[in-house]
Amino acid sequence: MNEPVLECRALHKRFVQGILDVEVLHGVDLRIRRGQRLAIMGASGSGKSTLLHLLGGLDTPTSGKVLMDGIDLAALNERRRAELRNKTLGFVYQFHHLLGEFTVLENVAMPLLIGGASVARARDAAAALLRRVGLGKRIEHKPGELSGGERQRAAIARALVTRPKCVLADEPTGNLDSKTAEQVYQLMLELNQEFGVSFLIVTHDASLAHKMDEVLHMEDGRLV
């Protein structure tokens, strides 16, 4: 049976500040299975990014559960949660978040080094993946020397270098022109097939979203 690699049950999230009390998520249920490609669409402020942060273990829900590879995140301390997150998930954002003082190779190798891999193994794996995403001749360049599309390709390589089970992508092409966005999406689809990794993508682009296996819509903190 294809068990979920990432799941949330009855997920609620409230933000309270002074007299302000806003419930952003209202009992969200979601399962992501191995190799599945899901897109979530919705207006700004509908709760999409909040959901991704909770699924990624980057924030804690007000109530409900997040299960990562079958493990309840609430049962883990911060160190164990970070270890599980590093092993199970990859992250891609609208802005690449590559570190400007490091080369592209060093940026992509970093998750493996954080996970305890040797420098040689981390560099070899990063170089191989950078070649796969078309950046084999750019590995010693700094992020500032790359185009927007190249930086996002490097960010995708960084997300996949640990061979995660699922990649969470928040508007991964939102900062790119339409042609480059199409190329980046095509790359993600190819890597989904090659590595069997799941993709959960938040996007405003309907044409790109419909390349996924399933498109979900978020309205006022609920998946509909």
Curated annotation (Swiss-Prot):
One GO cellular component, as annotated: plasma membrane
CDD domains documented for this protein: ABC_MJ0796_LolCDE_FtsE
Compartments (UniProt record): Cell inner membrane
Assigned EC number: 7.6.2.-
Topological type in the membrane: Peripheral membrane protein
Residue intervals of the ABC transporter domain: 6-224
Origin superkingdom: Bacteria
Location (main, coarse): membrane
GO terms for biological process, alphabetical: lipoprotein localization to outer membrane; protein localization to outer membrane
Matching PANTHER family: IMPORT ATP-BINDING PROTEIN (PTHR24220), LIPOPROTEIN-RELEASING SYSTEM ATP-BINDING PROTEIN LOLD (PTHR24220:SF689)
Task of the protein: Part of the ABC transporter complex LolCDE involved in the translocation of mature outer membrane-directed lipoproteins, from the inner membrane to the periplasmic chaperone, LolA. Responsible for the formation of the LolA-lipoprotein complex in an ATP-dependent manner.
Subunit and interaction comment: The complex is composed of two ATP-binding proteins (LolD) and two transmembrane proteins (LolC and LolE).
Protein name according to UniProt: Lipoprotein-releasing system ATP-binding protein LolD
Organism field: Methylococcus capsulatus (strain ATCC 33009 / NCIMB 11132 / Bath)
Organism ancestry: Bacteria, Pseudomonadati, Pseudomonadota, Gammaproteobacteria, Methylococcales
